């Protein structure tokens, strides 16, 4: 007797009007995560998840497609306005913000949360010449 296949749970669509878009932009990749105000993730996207590989992941064009994909997933959950938090020095920062706006999300604020060291770790030894 064959075992019945377990039924996959249907995704419950939430209706959350406000969200936070976290853009993590490094020199190698860009990751966009849209969460509700409590921090629960509604949708996310990255260059690798879309299909970019290697050095193409670090381009502004990749960041644009990433933001559009994350915004589409957020809008499926009812998000209409987002507050943007940008972290990191990468090339996809501005392109990701513009793409969120073009996708139909209203941006209420933009905040830069890039970590800056208060004198951090000791630098490497100076080259002797």
UniProtKB/Swiss-Prot annotation:
SUPFAM superfamilies for this protein? Translational machinery components
Under PROSITE patterns, the record lists: RIBOSOMAL_S11
Q: Which UniProt keywords apply?
A: Ribonucleoprotein, Ribosomal protein, RNA-binding, rRNA-binding
**Mind telling me which residue stretches traverse the membrane in this protein?**
none
Q: Which GO terms describe its biological process?
A: translation
Instruction: Give the protein's function.
Output: Located on the platform of the 30S subunit, it bridges several disparate RNA helices of the 16S rRNA. Forms part of the Shine-Dalgarno cleft in the 70S ribosome.
The record describes its quaternary structure and partners as: Part of the 30S ribosomal subunit. Interacts with proteins S7 and S18. Binds to IF-3.
UniProt similarity note: Belongs to the universal ribosomal protein uS11 family.
Q: State the protein's name.
A: Small ribosomal subunit protein uS11
Gene for this chain:
rpsK
């Amino acid at each position: 007797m064959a075992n019945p296949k377990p039924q996959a749970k249907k995704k419950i669509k939430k209706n959350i009007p406000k969200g936070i878009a976290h853009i993590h932009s490094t020199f190698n990749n860009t990751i966009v995560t849209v969460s509700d105000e409590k921090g629960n993730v509604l949708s996310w996207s990255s260059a690798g998840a879309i299909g970019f590989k290697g050095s193409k992941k670090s381009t502004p064009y990749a960041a644009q497609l990433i933001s559009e994909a994350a915004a589409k997933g957020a809008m499926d959950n009812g998000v209409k306005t987002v507050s943007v938090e940008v972290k990191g020095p990468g090339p996809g920062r501005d392109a990701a913000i513009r793409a969120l706006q073009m996708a139909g999300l209203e941006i209420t604020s933009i905040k830069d949360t890039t970590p800056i060291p208060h004198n951090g770790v000791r630098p490497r030894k100076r080259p002797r010449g």
